[in-house]
A protein has these predicted regions:
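Conserved helix-turn-beta segment immediately C-terminal to the redox Cys motif
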Residues: 33, 51-71, 85
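Thiol-/selenol-based redox modules, centered on thioredoxin-like
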Residues: 118-145
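Sec-dependent N-terminal signal peptides
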Residues: 4-13
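Thiol-based oxidoreductase modules, predominantly thioredoxin-like and allied folds used
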Residues: 65-78, 90-98
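A short beta-strand-turn-helix
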Residues: 17-35
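Short, internal strand/loop/helix patches
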Residues: 84-118
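Short pre-active-site segment immediately N-terminal to redox-active cysteine/selenocysteine motifs
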Residues: 33-35, 39-43, 109
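Conserved redox-active cysteine motifs that mediate thiol-disulfide chemistry
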Residues: 39-56
Length: 145
């Protein structure tokens, strides 16, 4: 029954993104682009609010200069898929159930996002997501484009 429900969820899910294993993540392959790197989990309410905004960024900025990479930290794949069944994602998602990448980035809260310039340098870090700050977030992106 559990497998049936998961399969059903995958079929009706609004997910547009590809989901990858964290071991497939290669930030260097995006060199030359500004990267918005976002860590999230299914239980995180602010994470749900950030997804529509991140989707809008992909439509706003040129794909050859900007990309979004998100990393899900749910231990259980089912929790991630359940979340993605409710919230549309137009960007690629990497699943890091052990938190190995999160540990390297020394996360302090959820969600946490990093703005990485086209040379691969982390230039901004945001803990949490606040809709009242989206203009600021976008200015920071535009300064790097």
């Amino acid at each position: 029954m559990k497998k049936f429900l998961l399969l059903l969820l995958l079929v009706i899910s609004p997910v547009r993104a590809e989901i990858y294993d964290i071991n497939q993540l290669d930030l260097k392959s995006h060199q030359g682009k500004v990267i918005y790197l976002d860590f999230w989990a299914s239980w995180c309410k602010p994470c749900q609010k950030s997804f529509p905004w991140m989707n809008s960024l992909l439509a706003k900025y040129p794909a050859d200069k900007f990309t979004i990479i998100t990393i899900n930290l749910d231990a259980e794949t089912e929790a991630m898929h359940y979340f993605l069944g409710k919230v549309k994602a137009d960007f690629d998602i990497y699943h890091d159930p052990s938190g190995q990448i999160a540990e390297q980035f020394e996360l302090e809260g959820m969600p946490t996002s990093y703005l990485i310039d086209s040379n691969g340098k982390v230039v901004k870090k945001h803990i949490g997501f606040y809709t009242k700050k989206v203009d600021q977030y976008e200015r920071e992106i535009e300064e790097l484009l």
